[in-house]
Amino acid sequence: IWPRKIYKTNCQGNYKTKKSKKIKSTFDLVRIIEKTVPKKFQMGSIHCATRTFQALRIAVNKELDNLKEFLPQAFGMLAPKGRLVVISFHSLEDRVVKNFFKDIFEKGVVKILTKKPITADTNEVLANPKSRSAKLRAVIKS
């Protein structure tokens, strides 16, 4: 929903003048996002532009592609009874890890040590707010 609204707000420009505005800085992008996202979704401790910048970072750094390439390599280096433990910080990463672990489990080459991901408890999140989205998954090679 938001990408379409951001496009309409910025790329299509003002409907009366038909001028498109150039984004010259991250502050310009934040301003556009703040104008686009309804106020009721701007409440809370996480800024409404956070996910947009996260999506840009993930795409530019090819984080999901790198993770998909890394996991089989890391698993291939494990000795028998070796453990592969992965911490993910957002749902897209977690889905890649979960699916990889599921695939190798179905091949019978690992035992899953964490049926559900381990997440930070309330005390940890209070002490370390960045841990709120962390999910730990682990397998042991047969």
How should each PLM-predicted stretch be described?
Residues 1-142:
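S-adenosyl-L-methionine-dependent methyltransferase catalytic core, i.e., the SAM/SAH-binding region
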